Amino acid sequence: MRIGILGGTFDPIHYGHIRPAIEVKEALGLDKVLLMPNHIPPHKHQPNLSTAQRLKMVADVCAELAGFELCDIEANRDTPSYTVVTLEQLSTQYPNAELFFIMGMDSFIHLQSWHKWQQIFGFANLVLCQRPGWHLSNEHPMQQVLMARSAAIDTLKNPPQKHHPIHGRIFTVDITPQDISSTQIRSALAIGKIPTDALMPVTLNYIQKQQLYLS
């Protein structure tokens, strides 16, 4: 089994998260994608909504998307949501699965600042979402990591080895640009605008019913 993992504050979850995840799932032939809300994000400010509210929104989205599941492993932890700790737990939970941690290129270029970042490759593969035509400069310190671990998507045509899951590779997927951010959505909602083009109906319905993000 091949499992994608997309973490985030999801405050709120929107098409800028969902559409790239769908494109990655299709491009790599993943069996499922876990959407994983952070509880205590180590690289961001605390979310506006409670963990329970964000879990509810993500659960509602997963209920409408085939092959997507809510992962609450970080939400149930009262310590910072370090990726390496999470992936170690997931590799134990899914011992025969190949894990694919999905991240934007904007996060990858700062990977060296993450807690025990080099150990991440011992538990999972990375999937980098990038805009078509964008490339990391040769001078960037992460370029050597990318070159050393880069793998072609075609190598995934062969089924995974059940008892010998492969990790440590980096796959790059060109995704459709999404000019959407949670900050923009929160700002719009605060002044009474309804961003129907940015949110799934089930998410918007929950936000309106609970009167969230009102200033």
UniProtKB/Swiss-Prot annotation:
The EC number(s) this enzyme carries: 2.7.7.18
Enzyme class per UniProt: transferase
Pathway info: Cofactor biosynthesis; NAD(+) biosynthesis; deamido-NAD(+) from nicotinate D-ribonucleotide: step 1/1
Coiled-coil region: none
Domain of life: Bacteria
GO molecular-function term, one example from the UniProt record: nicotinate-nucleotide adenylyltransferase activity
Family label: Belongs to the NadD family.
Protein name per the record: Probable nicotinate-nucleotide adenylyltransferase
